[in-house]
Amino acid sequence: MRWSAYWTRALARRLIRRLLAGDGGDRLQPRWLPRRWVTVVSGDIDPDAGVAVLWVVSRPGHESAVSYSMAFERCGEEWTSTGGGSSSSDAAAVRRRLPVGSTGQLGMIELGGGGGCPSRAHLLQHPDDWMSAPWVGSNTLQVAAEVDHLVVGERRIEVPANGTLVVAWKAPPSTVRGGVRPRIAAIGADGTELAVLGPRDQMDSHTWARVLGD
């Protein structure tokens, strides 16, 4: 409970400020915060859409390690939590990045878990208008070593050294439960588009090509 309160009220707010200042990717870990206590796995923010997501692991490498994720939306001047989760795993903190096609990294972009909810900012202004509320969502991704960065919708997102990250997004109102995730493209160091994960895809285009080729 103590950690949960600190995570939501103090650390998360500091990390959001760092994201707003442009300190994403591997720069998101505060220098004053030892990784052996808390490892900041990933964070993402879309200031224009007013959405953010954070992922940290407490006590990585220890039997009591816990992974925490939490999504946020800007409501007025405040960043408000829209939900999150935890699990007894530190895999994201200790994972090393793997080349595509290897055991544990079949595709350029591996889609992990995700979640979301109707926009709270919209519902604060229009409490009875659920049908017109945008969807605020997030997803975890595992990216191959060949990928330099991602393009999520129109945004460029840096990939952390271990290739594991979270992305935040906001989608227009939709009849599809859970909203429609934006297009995600994996880009190589030379600017080549290596693979695409479409809005409704569970596998990226590189993986599909290998499956159909076999």
Region spans (language model):
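Serine/threonine-biased, Pro/acidic-interspersed low-complexity stretches characteristic
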Residues: 1-142, 175-214
